[in-house]
């Protein structure tokens, strides 16, 4: 659906190459080689998908790219959100793990999006979000300090990607994720039991 010029552009080609390498284990050297679909050799869990979405390009660590500006990886300057879903027969129990800025710099926070979106992160109604998906209003891209997402974007934009503290920060991110994820399985089990009697 894209012309060859766009498919071959480094900013598009590199992130596809990185993702397909993580999914298939193979390195594709041309945009024309990328498969349209594959049968995975294993089941991908939440952590596998998060790992793919957090991928950086070796070109991103080139000298001078202090603030992750080149963006040849999957996690790039224009990635302001990233979501991984775990589907369930009952839509109320669909789980989401969401970052509010670059996934390589911020934690995935667990939530149940169809149970009720967290008011702190939902600045559009479902209807507005669906309508704006392909026809967004210009003001949706304007800086608004009252939108919680901007606190995360401000932080991501101030992280010096080349600084040694970047790796330390990511250890903190993983530690926070572990803490946030700890009660999930027990909470889900309890919620499903309660749903049987409600």
Q: Model segments located where?
A:
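C-terminus-biased signal that marks the final domain/tail of proteins
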Residues: 1-198
